Design a protein with these regions (language model features):
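Bacterial Sec-dependent N-terminal signal peptides
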Residues: 1-21
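Glycan-recognition and catalytic cores of secretory/periplasmic carbohydrate-active enzymes
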Residues: 18-200
Length: 200
């Protein structure tokens, strides 16, 4: 008990001692993104990671993290209001636009909300809203009302017929958002049913 009290008393001091210079971190992020943009002008692929030789490993837009790179660009634009970041964010967001019709993944929330969602939030571009609504429709096709869950992946070797992983929960925001924006309660109902059944 004495240890818990000591930890409770010292925790605020430890947190205070670890202040982060947010401006410095954003400057570093800007430098890293500028390097990536210079090294990877091809928007037909998504930047995955840096190799030891300074080149980049790329993935197709259907990769589940494809929205993170444009999402980061939108965050830089939000912080700086620098038009170069908005231009880059729009370019890389457009690169994942075709995924709005992707019915083969449960990760559309990651892919589309980070890119188009941040773009819509910051620019109010009505085209971004349309893309997000279509993305929600595509995600909703993975829901089986008889099972009451959104399927993570299509069947694959290993015997799983209807695989469902916890990560699906992180994509439900797209469905809640679409329900609110369109007035269609079916998106919300799918999200709630999936969440309730995931808890079982």
């Amino acid at each position: 008990m004495k240890n818990l009290i000591l930890i409770a008393l010292l925790a605020p001091i430890a947190v205070f001692a670890q202040k982060i210079d947010v401006n410095k971190q954003f400057k570093l992020a800007e430098q890293q993104y500028q390097r990536m943009l210079a090294a990877q002008p091809d928007t037909s692929v998504t930047v995955h990671s840096a190799n030891h030789d300074g080149t980049y490993r790329n993935m197709p837009s259907k990769w589940w993290c494809s929205g993170f790179f444009p999402g980061g660009l939108w965050q830089l634009y939000e912080r700086s209001h620098n038009a170069q970041w908005e231009k880059a964010a729009r370019l890389w967001t457009a690169a994942v636009k075709k995924e709005q019709y992707n019915t083969g993944t449960h990760d559309l929330g990651f892919m589309m909300f980070d890119s188009f969602g941040n773009g819509l939030r910051l620019t109010k571009d009505p085209e971004y809203k349309k893309v997000l609504i279509q993305s929600a429709k595509s995600l909703a096709t993975r829901f089986d009302p008889n099972i009451g869950l959104i399927k993570s992946w299509n069947s694959f070797k290993g015997g799983y017929k209807y695989p469902v992983i916890i990560d699906n929960m992180m994509n439900l925001d797209l469905l809640f958002w679409a329900s609110k924006e369109t007035g269609d309660p079916s998106f919300k109902q799918i999200a709630l049913t999936h969440a309730d059944n995931t808890m079982k």
